[in-house]
From Swiss-Prot:
UniProt protein name: Chelated iron transport system membrane protein YfeB
NCBIfam families on file: PRK15056.1
Residues annotated as binding ATP: G44, V45, N46, G47, S48, G49, K50, S51
Record family assignment: Belongs to the ABC transporter superfamily.
SMART domains: AAA (SM00382)
Gene Ontology molecular function: ATP binding; ATP hydrolysis activity; ATPase-coupled transmembrane transporter activity
Source organism: Yersinia pestis
Underlying gene: yfeB
The ABC transporter domain, residue ranges: 11-246
Biased composition (Polar residues): 286-296
Keyword DNA-binding among UniProt keywords: no
Cellular component per GO, a single term: ATP-binding cassette (ABC) transporter complex
Compartments where located: Cell inner membrane
Keywords in alphabetical order: ATP-binding, Cell inner membrane, Cell membrane, Ion transport, Iron, Iron transport, Membrane, Nucleotide-binding, Transport
InterPro entries: AAA+_ATPase, ABC_transporter-like_ATP-bd, ABC_transporter-like_CS, Metal_Ion_Import_ABC, P-loop_NTPase
Length: 296
């Protein structure tokens, strides 16, 4: 069975402000736009509004001001069409609930079924292909609570694949997984991007952002910067976004070079995978994106 052909979606978040009933404004005047065929990182400190932004895109909270549209239609239309798929944090899931891997993946088809939720032959074929694509065919009849952290992540990726959404939202997909699983997830996301999906990834893993993302949104109650990795994921913008939270390590001069090369290495980390910058100014792109360009 071939992969479905998607019409590339366009996500527009226009001047969105979300104020909760207790009066707390979680995000304000947030604006950006993205098109299909893109992997975009959503980066910010805890409490910066990332979760609220995700909820507004998923229609779980209604903006007090502004609007969210997918492919020039209100987000409510996209929800009715089941075109937004969500991969949650593992901490948000009750792993003691007795359910099989294949049943979790089948949940991605619920929006396509009638109220009796009896899967069709097509539903079963799509679920089989989704499980195969994330490499869990041998574990399809296992209880999900028995799986490792990385395997659980892949189950929910398979559910998102089965849903056949054009917009995928992933909340901290690399937390608690090993390097091999992280690389497998990245490879899958890149293949989905190449098929035309729009993928928005909330992550604290700064070091991996320039390696697999095309765009980045930096948020701290509002969108501080948004654009291509090479021009937006800079030391200057990260310092603006994270304030004093990040730790800096700088190497320059004879500690780094045998000659008079004026460039410096700056390592920025929030105690997860660090971002490395090598250049003259705080506006230079990350070292990872420079090496990616040289290898392409």
């Amino acid at each position: 069975m071939s992969h479905p052909v998607f019409v590339r979606p366009e996500l527009v978040v226009d001047n969105v402000t979300v104020t909760y009933n207790n009066g707390h404004t979680a995000i304000y005047d947030a604006s950006f736009s993205l098109t299909g065929g893109t992997i975009c990182a959503l980066v910010g400190v805890n409490g910066s509004g990332k979760s609220t932004l995700f909820k507004s895109i998923m229609g779980l909270v209604k903006p007090s001001v502004g609007k969210v549209e997918l492919s020039h239609k209100p987000i409510s239309h996209a929800l009715k069409q089941n075109t937004i798929a969500y991969v949650p944090q593992t901490e948000d899931v009750d792993w003691n609930f007795p359910v099989l891997v294949e049943d979790v993946v089948m949940m991605g088809r619920y929006g396509k079924m009638n109220f009796l939720r009896i899967p069709s032959r097509e539903d079963k074929a799509i679920v089989n292909k989704s499980i195969e694509r994330v490499g869990l065919t041998a574990l399809r009849s296992r209880q999900i609570g028995e799986l490792s952290g990385g395997q659980k992540k892949r189950v929910f990726l398979a559910r998102a694949l089965a849903q056949q959404g054009t917009l995928l939202l992933l909340d901290e997909p690399f937390t608690g997984v090993d390097v091999k699983t992280e690389n497998a997830i990245i490879e899958l996301l890149q293949s989905l991007r190449d098929e035309g999906h729009l993928i928005l990834v909330s992550t604290h893993n700064l070091g991996s952002v320039p390696e697999f993302c095309d765009h980045v949104i930096l948020i701290n109650q509002t969108v501080l910067a948004a654009g291509p990795i090479e021009t937006t994921f800079t030391q200057k913008n990260l310092e603006m976004t994270f304030g004093g939270v990040l730790r800096h390590i700088n190497l320059s001069g004879t500690a780094l070079h045998d000659d008079n090369d004026p460039r410096t290495v700056t390592v920025i980390t929030d105690d997860e995978r660090p971002a490395v910058f090598y250049g003259h100014t705080k506006n230079d792109p990350p070292a990872q994106s420079q090496s990616k360009e040289q290898n392409s």
